[in-house]
Amino acid sequence: VSDALRAAIIAARDAGFATAAGYRFARLSDYFGRFLRHGNAYPDRVLRLFDRRRGGWRGKREIHEAASVDGPVETLAGDLIHYPYRSLMQQLAKTQRYAQMMAEHEHARGKRATWSKLVLAPAWRFWRGYLLRGGFRDGWHGLIYAYVRANYVRQKTIMLWLLQNNQPVQDPPRAPDRRSE
């Protein structure tokens, strides 16, 4: 946690956590050696400090799990320092896994892939994060982050289309290669 967030948490604790059932704060992500301070990456406000008697975790454990509380939530100053990816390959693999899980979730809810979702939604995700929210101010890091996030939307839509057309999303298991025996 940043020094500012540490001080805000201590102040809330010293007040007995009396003003809210939970506290959210900005998550500042390190993206391959640079903290992203613009675009869709920041401020990524998350609820992480809460009274367990008044809340808990909801959602699927693998994706989009979130804290939820009964009562008011306050935003604390400062940043939660976040190191989400060790490498670009890890991010791409995680993005693909999340895209598949979300496509399966949306398919189960009856959502459908459309050409506009395939073409326009990724473009909008990129332009919103990179231009409108200032991701370009993070340089190459911001460009790559915006591109990978847009590609997630594209992957999810393609996987949703595959599911609605009864096509496999993953490759079937391969038979062992016996040529080397």
What do the PLM-derived regions correspond to, one by one?
Residues S2-N166, R174, E181:
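Catalytic-site signature of metal-activated, phosphate-bearing donor transferases
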